[in-house]
C-alpha cells in the first residue's frame, strides 16, 4: 500500500479524512481541503486509542534507558557510586558496573502501563479538543481548548500510569532492594499499602497538567506555523513534538523532582531531613527538596529530563500521527467502491 502523503491516492484519502468531498462540495476551504485534524466520524475512538497505544509503547520503550538515568540524577542523596555528570557517562557506567541490561530494569512495567494509558490519553484529547473547539472557537483552533483537553486527558492517563511510575522508579534506583516488578509490587503492597501506588498522584497531576497544557498548546501552535494545512507531514510532527516536549519538560522540572522523591521515598534523604516514616504531599516534598539542596535541588536532572522528553514527544507524536493516518486511510479505502 502506498503511504506517501504526496501520492494521488493518499491525497484523495487525506481530502476525505479532512471532510473534503470533491463530488459533494461541502467541507472544502480555499485550498481545497480542511485541516487534517478535522477527521470525520470514520476516525473512530478505536483508531485514536490504537494509535495512542502504539505511540506510548514505542515512546517509553525507546527512551527508557535515558529515563532510568534521569531518575537516578534526581536522587537527593545519591550513593557515591551512583553520581553522574552526563547521560552518556551514566549509561556507560551503569552497564559496566551493574550489567548491560540494568538500564532497562522495569521497562516491562512501563510498557504495560503506557499502552492503555496513552490509548485513553489520545482518545480523550482528540474528542475533548474537537468538542471544545466548537465551543470556544467554532471556525478554527483554540489554544485554550487544546490546553483544557490536554489537562482532562492527563487525569485519565495518570490514573493508569501512576502505579507503573512508582514501581519502575523504585526498580531504576541504584542498589534497589527489588529484583523484579512482581517482588516490588508485593513488597510495596505489604509494607506501605495500596495508597503507596498513588502517594504521588496529586503531585503527578500537579506536574503533568501544566506540562501537558504547555505541551499540547505548543505542539498545536507549532503545527499551525510549519504545517498550516495540517496534512500528514512526518517532519513537522517530529519537530513540533520535540520542541513542545523540551519546553514543557524544562518548565516543570521542579515538580518532577518532587514526584521522584515521593515515588522513591529515599531513605538517606529522608534521614538527613529528620523525617521518620513516609513522606507524603506536594508541600512536604517541596520543603524537603529545599531543605536538602536549596533552589538548585529543584532542577536536579533537568538536562536528562529535557534530553529524555524532546525525542520522547517527537517519537510519540510522529508514531501517533502515522497510525492515525494509516488506520483512517485503511478504513476509507475499505469503504471505497470498486
From Swiss-Prot:
Key word Cell cycle present: no
Quaternary structure note: Interacts with ACB10; this interaction stabilizes SLC25A37 and enhances the function of SLC25A37 to import mitochondrial iron during erythroid differentiation.
Compartments where found: Mitochondrion inner membrane
Solcar repeats: 43-131, 141-225, 232-326
GO molecular function, one term: iron ion transmembrane transporter activity
TM ranges: 45-64, 106-125, 143-162, 200-219, 234-253, 301-320
Top-level taxon in the UniProt lineage: Eukaryota
Main location per the UniProt record: mitochondrion
Protein's UniProt name: Mitoferrin-1
Keyword list, A-Z: Ion transport, Iron, Iron transport, Membrane, Mitochondrion, Mitochondrion inner membrane, Repeat, Transmembrane, Transmembrane helix, Transport
Amino acid at each position: 500500500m502506498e503511504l506517501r502523503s504526496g501520492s494521488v491516492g493518499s491525497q484523495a484519502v487525506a481530502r476525505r479524512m479532512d471532510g473534503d468531498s470533491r463530488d459533494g462540495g461541502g467541507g472544502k476551504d480555499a485550498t481545497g481541503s480542511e485541516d487534517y485534524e478535522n477527521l470525520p466520524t470514520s476516525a473512530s475512538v478505536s483508531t485514536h486509542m490504537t494509535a495512542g497505544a502504539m505511540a506510548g509503547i514505542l515512546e517509553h520503550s525507546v527512551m527508557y534507558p535515558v529515563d532510568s538515568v534521569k531518575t537516578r540524577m534526581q536522587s537527593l542523596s545519591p550513593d557515591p557510586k551512583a553520581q553522574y555528570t552526563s547521560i552518556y557517562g551514566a549509561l556507560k557506567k551503569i552497564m559496566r558496573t551493574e550489567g548491560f541490561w540494568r538500564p532497562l530494569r522495569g521497562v516491562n512495567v512501563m510498557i504495560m502501563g503506557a499502552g492503555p494509558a496513552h490509548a485513553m490519553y489520545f482518545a480523550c484529547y482528540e474528542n475533548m479538543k474537537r468538542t471544545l473547539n466548537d465551543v470556544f472557537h467554532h471556525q478554527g483552533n483554540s489554544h485554550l481548548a487544546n490546553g483544557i483537553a490536554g489537562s482532562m486527558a492527563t487525569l485519565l492517563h495518570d490514573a493508569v500510569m501512576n502505579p507503573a511510575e512508582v514501581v519502575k522508579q523504585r526498580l531504576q534506583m541504584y542498589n534497589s532492594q527489588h529484583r523484579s516488578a512482581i517482588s516490588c509490587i508485593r513488597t510495596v503492597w505489604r509494607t506501605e499499602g495500596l495508597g503507596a501506588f498513588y502517594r504521588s498522584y496529586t503531585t503527578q497531576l500537579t506536574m503533568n497538567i501544566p506540562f501537558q497544557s504547555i505541551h499540547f498548546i505548543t505542539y498545536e501552535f507549532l503545527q499551525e506555523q510549519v504545517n498550516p494545512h495540517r496534512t500528514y507531514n512526518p517532519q513537522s510532527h517530529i519537530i513540533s513534538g520535540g520542541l513542545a516536549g523540551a519546553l514543557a519538560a524544562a518548565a516543570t522540572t521542579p515538580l518532577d523532582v518532587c514526584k521522584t522523591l515521593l515515588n522513591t521515598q529515599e531513605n538517606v534523604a529522608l534521614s538527613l531531613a529528620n523525617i521518620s516514616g513516609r513522606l507524603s504531599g506536594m508541600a512536604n516534598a517541596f520543603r524537603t527538596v529545599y531543605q536538602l539542596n536549596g533552589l538548585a535541588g529543584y532542577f536536579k536532572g533537568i538536562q536528562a529530563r529535557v534530553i529524555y522528553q524532546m525525542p520522547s514527544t517527537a517519537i510519540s507524536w510522529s508514531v501517533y500521527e502515522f497510525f492515525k493516518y494509516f488506520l483512517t486511510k485503511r478504513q476509507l479505502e475499505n469503504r471505497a467502491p470498486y
